[in-house]
Each structure stands twice: as C-alpha cells, then as structure tokens.
C-alpha cells in the first residue's frame, strides 16, 4: 500500500484554520471539555503540563496513547499531541492514533541531538517551536505547517515569548529589505535555508502561522502576544495551574479575540483568582531552559 502524505498546501491550510484562536494543554477528558466549552480552537493532549514536567525533572516522553484517545473521544475540536524531537516512532504512533497535529516539542526530552524529523514524510501536519528566523526557516524547510515561539514553558513568565516573537518579526522585516543577491550570505550566517528566505521575502511574512507559546498566564499576556503579531496563542500550564481554570480559560480566549479592547480585558481580569505561580528566568540553570533544546 502506498503511503500518501498530506500536501504542503493542505497541511498549512489546516493550521491557518486555527488562526486567531487559543490552543490549551490538557491531561484528561474533563480538562479537554473545559477547554472546548471555553472556546479553545484545539487542545494539546499530554500526561503532564509543562510546569509539572519541569518540577518532576528526569526524562519526559510522549503521552500514553490511552490519554490521547480519551481526549480525542471527549471533544469535537482538533487534538494535538507532542512527540520528542527526532523521535520517528513516537511521531508515527501519534499519526496512527489519528491526532490532528503533532508538536515536535522541546518541552519533552529530545530523542535526537542532531536531527529533527523530516515532517514532509507524514500525513499529519506538524507544529514546531522557534526563537529566531534561522530556527523558523529550518523547521519550515523540514515541513512544519505551524510555528510557535518557544518562550520558556512552565514558568508563567511571558518575557521569553515576547523576546522570541519580537526577534522573529524583526528578522522578517530585515529579510524583506534585502536584495535577493544578499540573501545567500544572510542564509549562511543564520543557518536559514535560502529557498525559505526567498519565500519569506516574497510574502513579507512567514509562509506558515506563528503562534505565541511559553509563559502565557493571564488574559493580558495573551493580548500582548497578539499585539506583537502572534497568529494565536498556546497556553500550557497557565489554565490548569491557575486558581480557577474555567474562568481563566474563558478570559484568555476572549482576550485573544479582543486584544485591543482594554476595557474588556480589564473586566475579564477581575476576580479571576490567582494565576499560576511564576518563575523568574534568571533563576533557571542552563540545563533547565527548555528553549535551548532543538537546533
């Protein structure tokens, strides 16, 4: 039987359908239903949210397929799941389960310290993290259909997501201003594939959607990332590590949609209870910084 992979246009189109929305991490059917009722456009099924992965340490792997199937059976919105960077078999297992997207994620412990997956070989579209134009372009060349900032997952601290979004957007503007004969040197210096840079220059933007992720903890955080140019928002630990997950979920969805309505964001932020406990980035050891994973 011939293995028919999804075309690049179809995969990118599927990701475009999530634009402007919020994607929430969930660990069971109950949380998935809360996310769907709050207006999430998709959920990410995993065993532990990033804050718990960070706290537990050790090796973090793909979720038990039972959890993924439980979440898939509980909601009608798309379901994503994470595999380790470079783990061919975890990705194939998730594809066989019928997930809607796979996140080749630095939140999990990398399986390969040299190679990312060739995502063009799969029918299912992939999501990947990036901090700059080099990482973004390499993931696109490998076949990623959606990007997200890496931020610093599980910290409840938005500063790294802001840094990464600003960095990528500044470099897009730089690429757009370069002559085509200057792009090859830029490609060499950044490790960005030349053909992807040409596409970015032609479009004046990335050819795939770029969501914010890694540290979104409040409605204001979500609105901030949208104002900085994010196409949507991933919320990992920020929902179910907060004092009132259902209220936080609804408020973050509304703030993402109405990110320039400050009176509404103020109203949404009232009486929410405590957000997740945050971590100052400077207190993390180099080996604790998940954003450093991937290349």
From Swiss-Prot:
Gene Ontology molecular-function annotations: pyridoxal 5'-phosphate synthase (glutamine hydrolysing) activity
InterPro entries to which the protein is assigned, alphabetical: Aldolase_TIM, PdxS/SNZ, PdxS/SNZ_N, RibuloseP-bd_barrel
Pathway note: Cofactor biosynthesis; pyridoxal 5'-phosphate biosynthesis
Binding site for D-ribose 5-phosphate: 25, 154, 215, 236-237
Intrachain disulfide bonds: none
Any one biological process term the GO annotation gives: amino acid metabolic process
Gene3D superfamilies registered for this protein in UniProt: Aldolase class I (3.20.20.70)
Residue ranges crossing the lipid bilayer per the database entry: none
Catalytic activity: aldehydo-D-ribose 5-phosphate + D-glyceraldehyde 3-phosphate + L-glutamine = pyridoxal 5'-phosphate + L-glutamate + phosphate + 3 H2O + H(+)
PROSITE patterns: PDXS_SNZ_1, PDXS_SNZ_2
CDD domains: pdxS (cd04727)
The EC number(s) this enzyme carries: 4.3.3.6
UniProt entry keywords in alphabetical sequence: Lyase, Pyridoxal phosphate, Schiff base
Annotated binding of D-glyceraldehyde 3-phosphate, by residue: 166
Assembly and interaction partners: In the presence of PdxT, forms a dodecamer of heterodimers.
Known function: Catalyzes the formation of pyridoxal 5'-phosphate from ribose 5-phosphate (RBP), glyceraldehyde 3-phosphate (G3P) and ammonia. The ammonia is provided by the PdxT subunit. Can also use ribulose 5-phosphate and dihydroxyacetone phosphate as substrates, resulting from enzyme-catalyzed isomerization of RBP and G3P, respectively.
Cited PANTHER family: PYRIDOXAL 5'-PHOSPHATE SYNTHASE SUBUNIT SNZ1-RELATED
Protein known as: Pyridoxal 5'-phosphate synthase subunit PdxS
Taxonomic classification: Bacteria, Bacillati, Bacillota, Bacilli, Bacillales
């Amino acid at each position: 039987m011939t293995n028919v992979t999804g075309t690049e246009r179809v995969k990118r189109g599927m990701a475009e359908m999530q634009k402007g929305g919020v994607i929430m991490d969930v660990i069971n059917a109950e949380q998935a239903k809360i996310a769907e009722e709050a207006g999430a456009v998709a959920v990410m099924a995993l065993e532990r949210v990033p804050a718990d992965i960070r706290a537990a340490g050790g090796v973090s792997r793909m979720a038990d397929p039972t959890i993924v199937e439980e979440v898939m059976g509980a909601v009608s919105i798309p379901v994503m799941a994470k595999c380790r960077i470079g783990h061919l078999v975890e990705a194939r297992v998730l594809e066989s389960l019928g997930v809607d997207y796979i996140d080749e994620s630095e939140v999990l412990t990398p399986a390969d310290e040299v190679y990312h997956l060739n995502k063009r070989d799969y029918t299912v579209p992939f999501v990947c993290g990036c901090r700059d134009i080099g990482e973004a372009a390499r993931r696109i060349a490998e076949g990623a259909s959606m990007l997200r900032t890496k931020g610093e997952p599980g910290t409840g601290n938005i500063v790294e997501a802001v840094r990464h979004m600003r960095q990528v957007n500044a470099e897009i503007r730089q690429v757009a201003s370069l002559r085509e004969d200057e792009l090859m040197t830029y490609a060499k210096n950044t490790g960005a594939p030349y053909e992807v840079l040409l596409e970015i220059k032609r479009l004046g933007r990335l050819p795939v959607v770029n969501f914010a992720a890694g540290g979104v903890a409040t409605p204001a955080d979500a609105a901030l990332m949208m104002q900085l140019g994010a196409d949507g928002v991933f919320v990992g630990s920020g929902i179910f590590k907060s004092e009132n997950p259902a209220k936080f979920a609804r408020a973050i969805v509304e703030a993402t949609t109405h990110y320039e309505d400050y009176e509404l964001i103020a109203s949404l932020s009232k009486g929410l209870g405590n957000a997740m406990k945050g971590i100052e980035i400077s207190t993390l050891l180099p080996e604790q910084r998940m954003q450093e994973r991937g290349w």
